[in-house]
Amino acid sequence: MAASAGGPGSWSENILEYFLRNSQITAEDGAEITWYHAANHKAQTNEALKSTAHMIEADVLLPSDGSEHSQPIMAHPPETNSDNTLQEWLTEVMKSNKGIKLDFKSLAVVEPSMMLLENVKRHLKRPVWINADILPGPNGNSKVIDAKPFLDTVISFFPDVTFSLGWTTGWHPEKVNEGYSWTMVKEMEYICNELSQPVTFPVRAALVRQSCSQLLWLLKKSNRYSLTIWTGKNDNYSVEDLLYIRDHFDKKQVFYDILEPQNHEFKQAIGIKVNL
């Protein structure tokens, strides 16, 4: 367990402890945690809240009109508009007991979002993960968010939070895809070594197997660290790849935010019941 994870109901509480305490999972096993990904529009948010998912993941950006007073909205690039603002999203999510992961797509959206979160903090007694891609990763060509101002801004509002800090990545079906290099994991450790908060590293499923040595090294650096395996819609990876990860890493340190059909097949292979 993460030594510096917060106490019950804090934003940095380890999600396994939180959901065990609420009798929503049966073991300290990251594979038991279920996710609803991209709960951005109102329809998806409502579906996520009605679902059996433990954690709701959503994306926050500033709308494309660029006006000075624009409110943070819930959308994933290339979309730049939404029927849902962060404020409306939080109002709905507060009515549940689900954990939250907010993925920030620009530095500009962070401070106004933290101000909105500050207004509802007393109603959010659950894990809150704050995510950004802060380093270039394998085949990564999208813009990274500058780590220092991002971390400083979040911590100035909420020192007691869980960070999810990733690399920009790409995946190409027609060529050999390199994994996470030693340089990439060492750069990440250099940044996270200075933090006191729990940190999870979102890593792309199709790139993990060829990066096991590097990622095992990274996780051994602190008991505050974990991995969250995610998948691109068109990525080519097998359930065997997921089982390989399962066999080589501590079950308490790896979460799986993966798409169907692999999610179902993987859970079936390891004997975890899937509520569809």
From Swiss-Prot:
One of its GO terms (biological process) is photoreceptor cell development. GO terms for cellular component: extracellular space. Belongs to the menorin family. Essential for survival of retinal photoreceptor cells. This is Protein FAM151B.
